[in-house]
UniProtKB/Swiss-Prot annotation:
It comes from Homo sapiens (Human). Protein archease stimulates the activity of the tRNA ligase complex with high efficiency in the presence of GTP. This is RNA-splicing ligase RtcB homolog. Belongs to the RtcB family. GO terms for biological process: in utero embryonic development; placenta development; tRNA splicing, via endonucleolytic cleavage and ligation. The lineage of its organism: Eukaryota, Metazoa, Chordata, Craniata, Vertebrata. Ligation probably proceeds through 3 nucleotidyl transfer steps, with 2',3'-cyclic phosphate termini being hydrolyzed to 3'-P termini in a step that precedes 3'-P activation with GMP. In the first nucleotidyl transfer step, RTCB reacts with GTP to form a covalent RTCB-histidine-GMP intermediate with release of PPi; in the second step, the GMP moiety is transferred to the RNA 3'-P; in the third step, the 5'-OH from the opposite RNA strand attacks the activated 3'-P to form a 3',5'-phosphodiester bond and release GMP.
Length: 505
């Protein structure tokens, strides 16, 4: 029996201007409450989605995000609450922008591939340069072309970094350490990666032959979808101290943002795990509200296999971003006829947006070991946290928020409040407002390209027809999303960047 929209509203309560509570009973079997962070504009989108669903209009086969946050709150072993960040939108199982933590000491607690997503360790890396916008403007087209030539892009693109099966095994196990050994990374790059670019529990044997076959040719490639490399300039500095620690000292300074993940390999790891977990759920009699929330007990063989395979896919993504960093450094060096070192092409930070990790958090006054699922959300640890690099001990961890093609991006820093409210987690980007199919129907790709050109943005796209799926109109406003997190206190704004060139799959 489905409830009317007004009945649904009985279960929703506004805590403050940026946060709503989802009370138990909104969906069956909720173990904990849900919350979601919004501002006025984003709130309207969330409630419209719920209203449409009550009228029987689905969200491209997914439940509305609010329902998905509720269903995650019903998973065995969840602690504290199920959290929706301001860029939350419907996804497979978990909404994208939904995070949740599970108690590692609870034998019933689960791990769910839908809580990580298909593009395991999809993430963002930001490089700085000592160039100014005035240095780059005259050679902008040339630079965009050089990056497009150096970095393989598009759906079926193949990597240029030589890889054989043995290399792949080692890369899956070693992450950035592999790139370092092979000469594709600088030693300091590693310090500025989440997890130092290597998840230690990775086991290449838990990655299927099919996944490896998909992953081998794609290493060091950009892929399609929402993946891109952007040449950006610093548009605004909100926190000068934090910016200086990141090597950013003036407006107009040029940066490069790389947004990519584990390509076909991560997708296959997730698919394989979902099949295995369907069986494990029957065996262990695990009940979930939504079939897409297939999961397994953390301690079960299926749970452990997935975590080891997921870590290997995570390492693959870090190697991938390292390879693209290497190619970006080459492209810049070529155009400016100097060395990457002389251009100060250092990694500011590299964050993951889709990952599950074992972390220590204080819940109800007690320190607990939790498996934190972050899907379409970003780790945002506060100052003095032992897991962040020495350079950022006083500022808090840098958090990289990619906007959409042709809109601004942000660098945020983690806060103590975020640590207590959201397990040290904040938003990850703009969050879709229109489905991919709707975007293709509503927008014409030439209009999108022309609009970017009018904004003075150089663009190189491998598949122009995919451009409208990623047009700014298809997304929520990234500034709304970032400001909501800032006002809620779960992360603070440090730097705003705007694009001058986009390279895209």
């Amino acid at each position: 029996m489905s409830r009317s929209y007004n009945d649904e509203l009985q279960f929703l309560e506004k805590i403050n201007k940026n946060c709503w509570r989802i009370k138990k009973g909104f969906v069956p079997n909720m173990q904990v409450e849900g919350v979601f962070y919004v501002n006025d504009a984003l709130e309207k989108l969330m409630f419209e989605e719920l209203r449409n669903a009550c009228r029987g209009g689905g969200v491209g086969g997914f439940l509305p995000a609010m329902k998905q946050i509720g269903n995650v709150a019903a998973l065995p072993g969840i602690v504290h609450r199920s959290i929706g960040l301001p860029d939350v939108h419907s996804g497979y199982g978990f909404a994208i922008g939904n995070m949740a933590a599970f108690d590692m000491n609870d034998p019933e607690a689960v791990v769910s591939p839908g809580g990580v997503g298909f593009d395991i360790n999809c993430g963002v890396r930001l490089l700085r340069t000592n160039l100014d916008e005035s240095d780059v403007q005259p050679v902008k087209e040339q630079l965009a072309q050089a990056m497009f030539d150096h970095i393989p892009v598009g759906v079926g693109s193949k990597g240029v970094i030589p890889m054989n099966a043995k290399d792949l095994e080692e890369a899956l196990e070693m992450g950035v350490d592999w790139s370092l050994r092979e000469g594709y990374a600088w030693a300091e790059d590693k310090e500025h990666c989440e997890e130092y670019g290597r998840m230690l529990q990775a086991d290449p044997n838990k990655v299927s032959a099919r996944a490896k076959k998909r992953g081998l040719p794609q290493l060091g490639t950009l892929g399609a979808g929402n993946h891109y490399a952007e040449i950006q300039v610093v548009d605004e500095i909100f926190n000068e101290y934090a910016a200086k620690k990141m090597g950013i000292d003036h407006k107009g300074q040029v940066c490069v943002m790389i947004h990519s993940g584990s390509r076909g390999l991560g997708h296959q790891v997730a698919t394989d795990a979902l099949v295995a977990m369907e069986k494990a759920m029957k065996r262990d009699k695990i009940i979930v509200n939504d079939r897409q929330l297939a999961c397994a007990r953390i301690a079960s063989p299926e749970g452990q296999d997935y975590l080891k395979g997921m870590a290997a896919a995570g390492n693959y993504a870090w190697v991938n971003r390292s390879s693209m960093t290497f190619l970006t450094r080459q492209a810049f060096a070529k155009v400016f006829n100097t060395t990457p070192d002389d251009l100060d092409l250092h990694v500011i930070y590299d964050v993951s947006h889709n990952i599950a990790k074992v972390e220590q958090h204080v819940v109800d006054g007690k320190e607990r070991t939790l498996l934190v699922h972050r899907k379409g959300s970003t780790r945002a640890f506060p100052p003095h946290h032992p897991l962040i690099a020495v350079d950022y001990q006083l500022t808090g961890q840098p958090v990289l928020i990619g906007g959409t093609m042709g809109t601004c991006s942000y660098v945020l820093t983690g806060t103590e409040q975020g640590m207590t409210e959201t397990f040290g987690t904040t938003c990850h980007g703009a969050g879709r407002a229109l489905s991919r199919a709707k975007s293709r129907r509503n927008l014409d790709f030439q209009d999108v390209l022309d609009k970017l050109a009018d904004m003075g943005i150089a663009i190189r796209v491998a598949s122009p027809k995919l451009v409208m799926e990623e047009a700014p109109e298809s997304y929520k406003n990234v500034t709304d999303v970032v400001n909501t997190c800032h006002d809620a206190g779960i992360s603070k704004k440090a730097i705003k960047l705007r694009p001058i060139a986009v390279i895209k799959g």
